[in-house]
Amino acid sequence: MEDWSARQYLKFEDERTRPSRDLLARVPLDAPGLIVDLGCGPGNSTALLAERFPQAEIAGVDSSPDMLRRARERLPECKFVTADIGAWSPQPETELLFANAVMQWLPEHPAVLRRLLAALPQGGVLAVQMADNTSDPALALQREVAAEGPWANNPEVRGAARDDLLPPEFYYDLLKPLCARLDVWHIVYNHVLAGPEAIVEWFKGSSLQPYLRPLDAGGREKFLAAYRDKIAAAYKQRFDGKVLLRFPRLFIVAVR
């Protein structure tokens, strides 16, 4: 499990794409020439950008070979590049940097956000969405399982938890000195999923991956079984058997 799985991620494509739509709706540009989709994944967010800005040159950047393979199949007219976003820099003429659900994975993301915004020309836009759910049960239970099982002394497993985001005020003070306009807001989604098992499947495509990668096949199954039991106890099934997955997300749109 050294790579992110596009197939697993896309099991919930509609739900995962919804924040991209909400972020894109707040981008105040009419006809940008060059757009870069940072952390483009399998191209679902890139497709939205291509639909809204059909005349633009659009590139996607990601570190996952499997995600990029799927993105290239989906959008052969776009350019996709393998790169570490933490070290990547935009071309001077880039007018929109679109980063949906990627920056939260970078512990140094505040410095990365500030550097990317500073690299944009006047009027350029940095649009960011980050998962802000580390205190919600689904992620708290991942940390519980990591601390309780036979893998508890494995430093890779114990260190797999994502850092909390900082308060909105922090991002405002960080970025406002560099831009003419800054908008920061939260949206809390309540995704209707088929049942507790669907929650496990959701996070197998994202935040469970760093916990599972260091384990062998048997360890992964045991980890998932323990997590599955905790999720079933924490998320009550509604009258129709479905569950609601609460998912808060932080949005930032900065105009240089």
Residues covered by each model-derived region:
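Conserved Class I S-adenosyl-L-methionine
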Residues: 42-44, 159-256
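Class I SAM-dependent methyltransferase Rossmann-like catalytic core
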Residues: 2-14
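Short catalytic micro-motifs in class I SAM-dependent methyltransferases
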Residues: 101-102
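A short acidic, Gly/Pro-enriched loop at the edge of an enzyme's catalytic core
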Residues: 89-97
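Class I SAM-dependent methyltransferase SAM/SAH-binding core
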Residues: 34-90, 111
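Conserved catalytic/acceptor-binding region of the Class I
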Residues: 110, 117, 121-194
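Conserved alpha-helix/loop element of class I SAM-dependent methyltransferases that forms part
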Residues: 15-34, 48
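Short conserved AdoMet
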Residues: 28, 54, 72, 76, ...
